[in-house]
């Protein structure tokens, strides 16, 4: 493989010219993919720590970050290896879109329990379709809203934890937690929950091809992964401390069914 493929991420010359995303806009898009699209399992990270314990849970988080960061780099090298390669196969993108509609619909049902699940999925589909037709450069503004939502989510959990003194739900009076897994058979379950938050690779080629300066791809990826990991750690650690072995599949469910929340 040439030095260009080994050391640089140069955009292919045969791509149609158009207005591109800046480094900042690309970082917004990367972070939004990790935190809010494929990272919809962010609220499940406390459950992952519940099954894995502190030591293995934190180790798995950094391991998954490192592996997926590295494979994100390899992905673009593969993209540039041969001309005419732009995205994942269409069939895979369709499958991902369907799974996203299902995930969003399930999440919205918690906020709107009186609306049927099918109706919520239809609403999610109607929202996603127009967004899919917008140029990625302009989607970066929507990505910023998604990032702010993730930050607000963490802030709300932390504030609630420090303002409560009784269990469960208090950071100053935490629930019982474990250093090591209490059931080793559930460890693969934790691995799946954690790595899901870093699996945004199917969208990365599209964001990369839209960058004004594709040679800054590594910088954008490193910043995005570092920021996302900080958010993941905060929600996982705080959620596990607050609810311990009572942690539900999504930490917000602990709030939904707890008096006073």
Residue ranges: model-predicted function:
Residues 46-51, 107-111, 124-146, 210:
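Membrane-water interface regions at transmembrane-helix termini and the short interhelical loops
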Residues 2-13, 18-22, 27, 73, ...:
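Membrane-interfacial loop- and helix-cap regions that link adjacent transmembrane helices
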Residues 26-34, 38, 42-45, 59:
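Residue-level signal for short hydrophobic patches within transmembrane helices
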Residues 40, 65-74, 124-133:
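Central hydrophobic cores of alpha-helical transmembrane segments in multi-pass inner-membrane proteins
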Residues 46-85:
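Extracellular loop-to-transmembrane helix junctions
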Residues 56-57, 138, 216-219:
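Residue-level recognition of membrane-helix boundary sites in multi-pass small-molecule transporters
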Residues 30-31, 55-59, 118-123:
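Hydrophobic alpha-helical transmembrane segments
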Residues 32, 60-61, 65, 220, ...:
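Alpha-helical transmembrane segments of multi-pass membrane proteins, especially transporters
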């Amino acid at each position: 493989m040439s030095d260009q493929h080994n050391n640089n991420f140069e955009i292919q010359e045969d791509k149609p010219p158009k207005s591109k995303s800046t480094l900042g806009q690309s970082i917004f898009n990367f972070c939004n993919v990790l935190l809010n699209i494929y990272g919809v399992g962010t609220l499940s990270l406390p459950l992952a720590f519940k099954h894995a314990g502190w030591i293995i849970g934190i180790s798995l988080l950094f391991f998954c970050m490192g592996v997926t960061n590295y494979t994100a780099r390899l992905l673009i090298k593969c993209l540039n290896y041969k001309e005419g390669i732009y995205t994942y196969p269409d069939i895979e993108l369709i499958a991902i879109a369907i799974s996203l509609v299902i995930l969003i619909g399930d999440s919205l049902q918690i906020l709107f329990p009186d609306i049927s699940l099918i109706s919520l999925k239809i609403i999610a589909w109607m929202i996603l379709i127009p967004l899919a037709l917008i140029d990625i450069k302009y989607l970066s503004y929507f990505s910023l809203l998604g990032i702010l939502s993730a930050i607000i989510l963490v802030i709300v959990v932390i504030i609630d934890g420090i303002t409560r003194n009784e269990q469960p739900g208090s950071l100053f009076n935490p629930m019982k937690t474990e250093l090591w897994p209490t059931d080793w058979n559930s460890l693969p379950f934790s691995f799946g929950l954690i790595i899901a938050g870093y699996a945004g690779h199917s969208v990365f080629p599209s964001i990369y091809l839209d960058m004004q300066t594709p040679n800054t791809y590594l910088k954008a990826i490193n910043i995005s992964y570092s920021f996302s990991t900080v958010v993941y750690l905060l929600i996982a650690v705080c959620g596990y401390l607050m609810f311990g072995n009572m942690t539900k599949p999504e930490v917000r469910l602990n709030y939904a069914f707890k008096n006073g929340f």
